[in-house]
Amino acid sequence: MSFTVAALGNREACAQFNPNGMEGAKRKNLDRPVSLMSLAVRQGVDSAELRGLCYNRFQADITIECPQMPAKGTLIKAGELTLGILLEGKACWPECVLFQENLPCPLIDGVRYAWVENPGTLCLGEVFEVVASDNPA
């Protein structure tokens, strides 16, 4: 499975990634250096009428176009950059209206966090490929 880079959080054509994440990005949790979001979820969040608490807060470092997000425990690579998808996922907040009304939140399945296995530069249109996975396909 492949994942095409549709947008970068710095709104530039390319970004540099080091072991701490995307250079210049603000990090809320140092244990989750890189955040990824699917393009379909990004578009859904942007056009939603009922907005969850995280809709305005969450900023993805990388937006990827893909039929489904990379599995947790997977290593993905684009050029020299290799990311490892963390097992930790996006959590819900009790004060969120979606959580309170038991409504689905697209961020739960449409967001992944990753560590930088091998630093490198990533540009729009580049394609991540799975290079290793803990999950048999």
Language-model segments: which ranges?
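Short intrinsically disordered coil segments
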Residues: 77-79, 100, 129-131
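Electropositive, beta-rich accessory/interaction domains or terminal extensions
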Residues: 1-94, 121, 134-136
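Well-ordered alpha/beta subsegment
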Residues: 112-137
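Active-site scaffold segments
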Residues: 82-86, 104-117
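Short, basic/aromatic beta-hairpin or loop at an interaction surface
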Residues: 51-59, 96-111
